Amino acid sequence: MAKTRVLLVDDDRELVRVLTIVLEDAGYEVLSAGDQHEALAAAARERPDAIVLDVMMPEGTEGFHVVWHLRRRPEPYFQNVPIVILTAIHSATPLRFYPDSTDGSYRAGEYLPVQGFVDKPVEPPALVAEVQRVLAAARAL
């Protein structure tokens, strides 16, 4: 049986290395991307079972823009793939991505079509638990 595949997107190579080990130890096959362009290409090419995506990406683009581009694609895969956001942004920090949000909180998940959030610095058990949770929820649909 094939392993569940997770696309891990972060420009911090050391963090990617560490989180890859964490996710592989939990039984996942890990694919990685270092920026939004690589993330979009890898998602289209590899069709991972889940995506773990950093908020602050290089070139001035937030990871939320990657979510926006993925969810705009018409194929059902892109509408349904579970996405977990990694973020060091505190909830009081306003984000441009939330034009309808009344409080600018990154936890206003109803304004963003993602399934989970994990705070940075990442606690490995929290990441594994969140990936397991979003995958289980996606399979239950």
What are the roles of these predicted feature ranges?
Residues D10:
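Conserved acidic carboxylate
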Residues R13-L31:
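Two-component/phosphorelay signaling modules centered on CheY-like receiver
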Residues G34-A50:
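Acidic, metal-coordinating helix/loop segments flanking the phosphotransfer/catalytic sites
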Residues A41, F64-Y77, G104:
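Short amphipathic alpha-helix used as the core "switch/output" element in two-component signaling
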Residues R47-D49, E75-P82:
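His-Asp phosphorelay/catalytic-motif detector in bacterial-type signaling
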Residues D54-V55:
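Active-site residues of response regulator receiver
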Residues R107, K120:
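A Lys-centered signature of the CheY-like receiver
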